[in-house]
């Protein structure tokens, strides 16, 4: 293959990928506004995996962490059911929702940044509302001491997420 063509093609793809419409990142000012509006960070977790982290008092890492390089979360609780139903309906078992804050995560040495949506593993984040929302990306795992509250998650027999107790429901 022609090296000049290969480099030119690579640069073109790089430039297309980083067009402004493909990049939503939060400035420190925007992050502060987001945290003021949404003071908590929520993460949906398989109960079995969370129970293991609690039992061992160890840091939990989601199954896609090695691929994604961060732990997915949302600050806007209105997205919890959409996220669950988009990414996790095929994952069997009970689920929980962890409520944290940027400060509680920081106290365990974990930084949180607010960015545009990103795929979870191989599943694209192409659900409605993702083009204008910033999502907290937790740059590490979640230690039990960072969690302020654990919420029950209700699902139906098809795996659809119906509610997160004391946070959001489908009604």
Go through each PLM region and give its residues.
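Conserved, structured core segments of small domains
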Residues: 28-171
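Bacterial Sec-dependent signal peptides at the C-terminal "C-region" and cleavage site
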Residues: 20-29
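Bacterial N-terminal signal peptides that target proteins for export
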Residues: 2-11
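Bacterial N-terminal signal peptides
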Residues: 11-20
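Compositionally biased, intrinsically disordered low-complexity segments enriched
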Residues: 10, 23-24, 74
